[in-house]
């Protein structure tokens, strides 16, 4: 029975590396994984999953209008898929997370989703909210705060490194925009 | 460093039993745990945590207005607390979940929260939403669907056992109102 | 696909309570679980699993000569089993753990095993060794050291509470014989 | 409080990639991790941790005589260590695993150990045995069997791909020597 996994973490934990390693494991055994990532994330070029550690692979793109069930079904009918891997899954919509449960339940294809848990205001992204609600397995990928404790929150900083407490949920950026911190230092940075 | 745990499950998985066992473990070592439960849940009498398997213990009550940080701090100052255990934590508000992070971060008291993940419409309760967002550890307590697979969703049924797809989020009830099922049988029961 | 779980912990973590709750969950859905425990453990009467919190249930017994595959197969043929629950699984032999993998792999019956990880000398029991080797899922049931940290080791004490560093691996006893402690206090108690 | 983690898996699951990503996470925050690997493993050159996916880093070497506590303490005194990462940890001796618990308990440095669980005969390696006994956290890194299920066992094959049921525990090799499989196909391959 296929299952849906949500691998969640703060930023810079190595989600994309873990995704690419899983994909490698499937291919190494002659299997056919399909990789998707958010069209919104053009940090490293469109249609690519890249990890800061130096790995990358081609990826299908999804945006808010994509019907991921249909897209995956089409790929599966062209060539049997053994697994789908979704990077930046926090950018999925509620409907797309539901479509992914159908990929798992109806097409019996495992879905491994990798993404952030909360935004810089500590609120769930829509995709994360419904993955946390419906996924079979919730697995935390760990990274560390500057204090050495586990980091599970994300601060958005301005160009002076000062934490920002308002603004749009999404402003794609690498290290210079976001910092992963523990809950204590998150509160401290936002003066809570 | 104290941590916040969210022990989540569908209904009838033994959350209260697990809570009572943890409390027992602390007391057995001469430590002082405090138990809280939702005032809304009067199935087994007010101010009590009871498990269907036959265990029960006195519990402090919280409702939407309770400041759980103040309530716990007061108890802690009267007699050092080694842990707080929250049953029916899905009924916490966003603000109360935040107050609990302060109990953990500022008073360094571990908080073990036990509750449902999603309601009969597959939506997160407010308490579950913010525990899934901010807790240090997410631990699933397993129970089974009638088909033998893991149950991670909840159906609300009418007196004829037919699944209901509308109504208030909360209608406190035991086996006769709610059934825990796997995702596939959840969809089937709601004709999805 | 059935799986083999090893729920391990130090002493007094509530393993038997957790086992009895799982059994209750299966029965509540009209399913048929079978409970086994070690004949060697006569603390609460033979053929019974009891938890210090006050719960108990009848149990089939196994000793070193029992062929658990045959015993389970016989029960299964008499009335379909949905799950087997093994208490005190540290007392299983290597061969019996292998037989349990056959119950899972050949009879497709889930096996939930509950037991200690290491003895008072920090060495694995034979049953624990092969469950740690072959089980599909390793799940820790937590309990606490007198210092508040997680307890993952066990000290055997004499009647004066002084830790003992030699003697037979097995001397069945309750609180008065054994104390669960964290690794640091384990080393301290044994003067390491 | 530092903890000891044992990241275990069958072969070709990406243990080295995960280790290198953890190391990268620490360095990215200006911290100083130390990497160790077994001198016995010269597949990719001595003193190097390499992952099949194309990543590598310098590593300190340990062999059966190395006192890892002294080696780490020396590094720590030269420049504060924030974490030690041990690859091929199955090749540690019992004494070396104990020394690592002292690194965690006495020097308060987290130890992340990555390695195999069982050998081609289904028996624990010495290092794995004592990590499974004493580690604070046991985390499984997943890979897949040719049948699509999770692989948790390892077959050693001859040049014709036929499973071998005897021979030394250690014969360092890549894909051509070892294949990770699920328990069912492990038994099948060895004619059990």
Swiss-Prot record, chains A, B, C, D:
It catalyses: thymidine + ATP = dTMP + ADP + H(+). This is Thymidine kinase. One of its GO terms (molecular function) is ATP binding. InterPro entries: P-loop_NTPase (IPR027417), Thymidine_kinase (IPR001267), Thymidine_kinase_CS (IPR020633). The gene is tdk. Zn(2+) binds at residues 145, 147, 182, 185. The active site is at 88 (proton acceptor). Homotetramer. One of its GO terms (cellular component) is cytosol. It is found in: Cytoplasm. Signal peptide: none annotated. Its main location: cytoplasm. Keywords: ATP-binding, Cytoplasm, DNA synthesis, Kinase, Metal-binding, Nucleotide-binding, Transferase, Zinc. One of its GO terms (biological process) is thymidine metabolic process. Belongs to the thymidine kinase family. Its EC number is 2.7.1.21. ATP binds at residues 9-16, 87-90.
């Amino acid at each position: 029975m296929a299952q849906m996994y949500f691998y969640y973490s703060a930023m810079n934990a190595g989600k994309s590396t873990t995704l690419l390693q899983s994909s490698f494991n499937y291919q190494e055994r002659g299997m056919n994984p399909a990789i998707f990532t958010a069209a919104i994330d053009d940090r490293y070029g469109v249609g690519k999953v890249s990890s800061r550690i130096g790995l990358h692979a081609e990826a299908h793109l999804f945006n808010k209008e994509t019907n991921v069930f249909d897209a995956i079904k089409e790929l599966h009918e062209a060539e049997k898929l053994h697994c789908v891997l979704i990077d930046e899954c926090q950018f999925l919509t509620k409907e797309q997370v539901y479509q992914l449960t159908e990929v798992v339940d109806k097409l019996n294809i495992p879905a491994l989703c990798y993404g952030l848990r909360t935004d810089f205001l500590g609120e769930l992204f829509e995709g994360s909210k419904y993955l946390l609600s419906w996924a079979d397995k919730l697995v935390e990928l760990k990274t560390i705060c500057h204090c050495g404790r586990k980091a599970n929150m994300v601060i958005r900083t301005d160009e002076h490194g000062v934490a920002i407490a308002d603004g749009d949920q999404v402003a794609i950026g690498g290290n210079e925009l976001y910092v992963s911190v523990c809950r204590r230092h998150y509160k401290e940075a936002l003066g809570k």
